[in-house]
Amino acid sequence: MTRFIDRVVIHARAGNGGNGCASVHREKFKPLGGPDGGNGGRGGSVVFVVDPQVHTLLDFHFHPHVVAPSGKQGAGSNRDGAAGTDLEVKVPDGTVVLDEHGQILADLVGEGTRFEAAAGGRGGLGNAALASRARKAPGFALLGEKGESRDLTLELKTVADVGLVGFPSAGKSSLVSTISAAKPKIADYPFTTLAPNLGVVSAGEHTYTVADVPGLIPGASQGRGLGLDFLRHIERCAVLVHVIDCATLEPGRDPISDIEALEAELAAYTPTLQGDSTLGDLAERPRAVVLNKIDVPEARELADFVREEIEAKFGWPVFEISTVAREGLRQLTFALWDMVAAYRAAQPAAVSRRPVIRPIPVDETAFSVVPDGQGGFIVKGTRPQRWVAQTNFDNDEAVGYLGDRLARLGVEDALLKLGARPGCAVTIGDMTFDWEPQTPAGVDVPLTGRGTDVRLEQTDRVGADERKAARKARRQSGDE
């Protein structure tokens, strides 16, 4: 029998970007061909896509690692590396994606809904793209960025029009099996249903879905029984139906007390759905009461006795049925369709949103420098950390290019203001190195006060009059 898995923890890792290529164009009669290294390809991303043919998270239970392909390295003759193909992962309709802290990242409802779970790394630039007037033939290229890697939790919340709630062995699975083609497991012991069962019900020319979920017991909102595993699957149901066992022999139970106990658990749970505010809390959903097992004479008498009291106390429609004798089922299915149709009519019409592209604002203060408490400094920021990760520290020219970029960004000025001295340890990302200040041209910066230059304060320079006097003295000595 196929296992139903509705909660898994997976590790999604996007592909790395390809490295750029450092090469020089070689051709006959062209001694100065110039750089022609291509850029690296972008890494593939991990994308979740809703597929109506997928109904469980079972595949992720056995294969929790999802890895997208990396981009290819650039080549000579200005050939860019191939980009990694995005890995489209099919998930069931109603999947909720949470991060490692339990925050909801996406609520995937509707066929074709997509969510980028992990972004692929950008490819490194080749030396052809790095060429400039100041650096006409770079002897280096940038490395590709690492792909995003994260741990995610996937939760499946059943998407159905009608949800059946009730105590264990109330006849919910039997009801679904008689009004639809679903074949759930049915037995005469509690918690026979361990996973939700979906059935498609036909009411004349109309169809809707019904979810049979595990039985509810007092304390389910705190995790007793199947607890939250049950309650999570009724969050998306537009109509809730209380299935009441009128033939139970358990002491202290009757239809009204069962309904009150079920409502107490729903009120204790009452999660407000994020991203689907039209449904609201569970207390706001339309309800119906089904008095089951009236094929038993005592149960029929009890149902007739409490029906008016239930309608007067709760104000919900009440139906008396027997799944064994198939009595009252047609009236129930059409009544549920009327409730579902009323809910669908109340929903706002879907409006296609025009995509709006907004440029990312440029943050001039995209970094911060803080002392590390040991005489060194830590530079934090998206751009400095990305630049360091793309630098090949085995290439001196690449290291110099990194220093130029950091200087233009203002990192060196910030270090000087904090009292950094040459040789102190500076940490950027995962790299720690000895800092040596430099100008974009590679000349050491004199550590003097602003507005002064020791090269202009030298007083031993020979002037024009002194040079003229020296020449005159040499001529006189030659005449003698």
Swiss-Prot record:
- The yes or no answer to whether the keyword Metal-binding is present is yes
Tell me where in this chain the OBG-type G domain is found: 160-341
Q: Tell me the compartments it is located in.
A: Cytoplasm
Q: Which UniProt keywords apply?
A: Cytoplasm, GTP-binding, Hydrolase, Magnesium, Metal-binding, Nucleotide-binding
Q: Where is this region: Disordered?
A: 441-480
Q: Name one GO cellular component term.
A: cytoplasm
Q: What EC number(s) would the UniProt record show? A: 3.6.5.-
GO BP: any one term: ribosome biogenesis
Cofactors needed by this protein, per the record, are: Mg(2+)
* KW Amino-acid biosynthesis (keyword) present: no
> Mind telling me which InterPro entries this protein's record contains?
G_OBG (IPR031167), GTP-bd (IPR006073), GTP-bd_Obg/CgtA (IPR014100), GTP-bd_prot_GTP1/OBG_C_sf (IPR036346), GTP1-OBG_CS (IPR006074), GTP1_OBG_dom (IPR006169), GTP1_OBG_dom_sf (IPR036726), OBG_GTPase (IPR045086)
Q: Give the matching PROSITE patterns.
A: G_OBG, GTP1_OBG, OBG, OCT
**Where does the record place the OCT domain?**
359-437
Biased composition range(s): Basic residues: 469-480
Where, in this chain's numbering, is Mg(2+) bound?
Answer: S173, T193
- What residues bind GTP, as annotated? 166-173, 191-195, 212-215, 292-295, 322-324
- Which NCBIfam families would you find in this protein's record? Obg_CgtA (TIGR02729), Obg_CgtA_exten (TIGR03595), PRK12296.1 (NF008954), PRK12297.1 (NF008955), PRK12299.1 (NF008956)
PANTHER family cross-referenced by the UniProt entry: DEVELOPMENTALLY REGULATED GTP-BINDING PROTEIN-RELATED, MITOCHONDRIAL RIBOSOME-ASSOCIATED GTPASE 2
What family, per the record?
Belongs to the TRAFAC class OBG-HflX-like GTPase superfamily. OBG GTPase family.
What does it do? An essential GTPase which binds GTP, GDP and possibly (p)ppGpp with moderate affinity, with high nucleotide exchange rates and a fairly low GTP hydrolysis rate. Plays a role in control of the cell cycle, stress response, ribosome biogenesis and in those bacteria that undergo differentiation, in morphogenesis control.
Q: What is this protein called?
A: GTPase Obg
State the organism of origin: Mycolicibacterium vanbaalenii (strain DSM 7251 / JCM 13017 / BCRC 16820 / KCTC 9966 / NRRL B-24157 / PYR-1)
* Gene behind the chain: obg
